[in-house]
Amino acid sequence: MASASGAMAKHEQILVLDPPSDLKFKGPFTDVVTTNLKLQNPSDRKVCFKVKTTAPRRYCVRPNSGIIDPGSIVTVSVMLQPFDYDPNEKSKHKFMVQTIFAPPNISDMEAVWKEAKPDELMDSKLRCVFEMPNENDKLNDMEPSKAVPLNASKQDGPLPKPHSVSLNDTETRKLMEECKRLQGEMMKLSEENRHLRDEGLRLRKVAHSDKPGSTSAVSFRDNVTSPLPSLLVVIAAIFIGFFLGKFIL
């Protein structure tokens, strides 16, 4: 009995499958989703294969059968048809890769499978896994597209600098000249203000000694005349502050 059961035992799968056990399909599933299955033949013999599924209406497989030469690889495209995805429903779909060593002078593939003995067949089973992209995956997919304008802005930013430097040099010279002129005006106005203040004191002394009644008139005239240079000094200071602020910025 042991020998009989050993005779009926299947051979281990000769092909190397990639992926070996799970076919992963990544959503969204509003369109056809394709995943690839690589079949590698590491032996020195030709191997016949065919791909079966428990849900033939839901998938399109190309190629679904064929012959793999020794040391060769065949890529099988498994295309999942669009459907309404329910995250709470686990996929029960499965695939099976069935293989058999090709007989010499093979001419009819269908006849090979029909005449194959059970102990000559080798098979591997794979389950289907449906995955929806999470928020992190969406952000990672968006990052490359965002990086382009960010890098572009960084590259575009420094481009005008050589031109702006030459303008700043010319503008700096003008500002320095304007500052010097305004400083000279301020010194001149300060000198005039000091002179007028001294003159006002002298006039008040003269008026006080000669005509006491005219003190208020002189004082009034001094109060009217004196703020004018002070106002000019304030205006000049504002201009200097404006130009210096522009220069610093």
From Swiss-Prot:
GO terms for cellular component: bicellular tight junction; endoplasmic reticulum; endoplasmic reticulum membrane; Golgi membrane; microtubule cytoskeleton; nuclear membrane; perinuclear region of cytoplasm; plasma membrane. SUPFAM superfamilies: PapD-like (SSF49354). It is found in: Endoplasmic reticulum membrane; Cell membrane; Cell junction, Tight junction; Nucleus membrane. Residues 14-131 form the MSP domain. The modification Phosphoserine is found at S166, S214, S216, S219. Residues 168-207 form a coiled coil. The record marks K50 as: Involved in binding the phosphorylated serine of the phospho-FFAT motif. Keywords: Acetylation, Cell junction, Cell membrane, Coiled coil, Disulfide bond, Endoplasmic reticulum, Membrane, Nucleus, Phosphoprotein, Tight junction, Transmembrane, Transmembrane helix. It is a single-pass type IV membrane protein. Residues 50-53 are annotated as: phosphorylated FFAT motif binding. Ubiquitous. Residues 2-228 are cytoplasmic. GO terms for biological process: ceramide transport; cholesterol transport; COPII-coated vesicle budding; endoplasmic reticulum-plasma membrane tethering; negative regulation by host of viral genome replication; neuron projection development; phospholipid transport; positive regulation by host of viral genome replication. The modification N-acetylalanine is found at A2. InterPro entries: Ig-like_fold, MSP_dom, PapD-like_sf, VAP. Residues 135-144 have a biased composition (Basic and acidic residues). Residues 135-166 are annotated as: Disordered. GO terms for molecular function: FFAT motif binding; microtubule binding; protein heterodimerization activity; protein homodimerization activity. Belongs to the VAMP-associated protein (VAP) (TC 9.B.17) family. The MSP domain binds the FFAT motif of many proteins. Endoplasmic reticulum (ER)-anchored protein that mediates the formation of contact sites between the ER and endosomes via interaction with FFAT motif-containing proteins such as STARD3 or WDR44. STARD3-VAPA interaction enables cholesterol transfer from the ER to endosomes. Via interaction with WDR44 participates in neosynthesized protein export. In addition, recruited to the plasma membrane through OSBPL3 binding. The OSBPL3-VAPA complex stimulates RRAS signaling which in turn attenuates integrin beta-1 (ITGB1) activation at the cell surface. With OSBPL3, may regulate ER morphology. Homodimer; disulfide-linked. Heterodimer with VAPB. Interacts with VAMP1, VAMP2, STX1A, BET1, SEC22C and with the C-terminal domain of OCLN. Interacts (via MSP domain) with OSBPL1A (via FFAT motif). Interacts (via MSP domain) with ZFYVE27; may retain ZFYVE27 in the endoplasmic reticulum and regulate its function in cell projections formation. Interacts with OSBP. Interacts (via C-terminus) with RSAD2/viperin (via C-terminus). Interacts with IFITM3. Interacts with OSBPL3 (phosphorylated form). Interacts with KIF5A in a ZFYVE27-dependent manner. This is Vesicle-associated membrane protein-associated protein A.
